Amino acid sequence: KAERVDVSILDGAGTKSGYSAVCEYDASNLLLVGITGTGTDRPTDKLRVYKYNKGTKKLTQWFELSWHGVFVQGATYVNGMLYIATNISEEKIHDGASVWVVDVKNQKLLDEMVILFDGEAEGLDYNIEDGKTWLYMGLGSPAGKFAYVGRFKSLYQ
């Protein structure tokens, strides 16, 4: 049975909004990651990160940053860094993906890695192998012509 999370505090809840990534923060909390606005790189867009406490079932906004990206397609948290997968261009133009790096302690956007290809990002996760953090991101074609999993070594260990 699925458990419904009350997301009524989100801007545009129930409409087309950019709140589309959930990842584990710690044993008690999940992070909900998304953007305000249309998801098409407007100057007023913001990245918002919310914490969802699994015990109290309470969703609270943690922080907000200026944002110059488009649709969020996935997120993962490891070693104090929040990695966010996005498309790199607006709707119906699929020419690649980005992985953004956010230092959550300092609430600061650190970096963006751009991957150019005829497709878009589809999810994001990590794995620690031999003490190194690797990011795994789905790379998919909107036309259904291909689907790959990309493996990227994190520069932020």
What is the predicted role of each segment?
Residues 2-13, 58-65, 108-114:
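A short beta-strand motif characteristic of beta-propeller blades
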